[in-house]
Amino acid sequence: MVAVGLFLSVQAWAALSAAGPSFLTTAEWETDRGHFGIASIMLGTALVALVAVGVAMPIAMGTSLFITNIAPARLRSLLVAMVDLMAAVPSIVYGLWGLFFFQGMAVDIARWINTWLGWMPWFSVNGADPNSPNASLTVYSASIFVAGVVVALMVMPIQTSVMREVFSQVPIGEREGAYALGGTRWGVIRIVSLPFARGGIIGGTMLGLGRALGETIAVALILSSAFNLKIRVLETGGNTVSKLIADQYSEASGFGLSALMAAGLALFAITLVVNFTASWFVSRSRSGAESDG
């Protein structure tokens, strides 16, 4: 990690020294004119990751609870294998699935959300008329929402695996005691399992967030490039750090390459903080389980 950080810092120094503090606040990316910054791409990166985690986290927690508390033994092993298989699917496969299959359904979902929740700034769409049956749906395609849902499928197995492990460590004595006192299955989950696994749930969610922040291929295939500061996730266009690097690296040289390295350094630092924080929560949850045992 230290070697990677040093390499990126050395390579990015020329761009960082030229841009100065404006590197953090500039939305445009015009390295030829010396006018560039990570404000818009960092916002896009955060929005894609938040959409992904917002979709994946409830599914991951529900799946892990079902596997550890409800599913019979035979079905449990099958579900675990299916979740592990999802984690092994290459990113390009998810990206192609999102581009050619899911996007057609996603625009209808996005229009429905815009119709009922468009009064919220992040669900509004410029140029959209949700009340017109003949309105074009292209304003909803290639959006942060579509990219985020596809990335959610990629981070969900990671979150499920971590949460499943933590839920499986809930002390049997506490669960059996709750059942003996007349607790229902849902009551035991709510009163015993969820409080015990709180650290693992947070850690698993943040590990998924770290993965979502750096996802490249799927996002590059789906998201239409746009360098502007906006929080409208249903609207066409957006950008992320990893997509920017993937799109421009092959043609970049000299100062342009240094600018890309600077963007990569910023993403590296944020991802490192997120992953270390997630690991701390998970290890704390595990140590608590061992001490209780």
Name these PLM-found stretches.
Residues 18-36, 94-152, 233-235:
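Membrane-interfacial helix termini and adjacent extracytoplasmic/periplasmic loops
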Residues 81-85, 89, 93, 159-171, ...:
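Transmembrane alpha-helices
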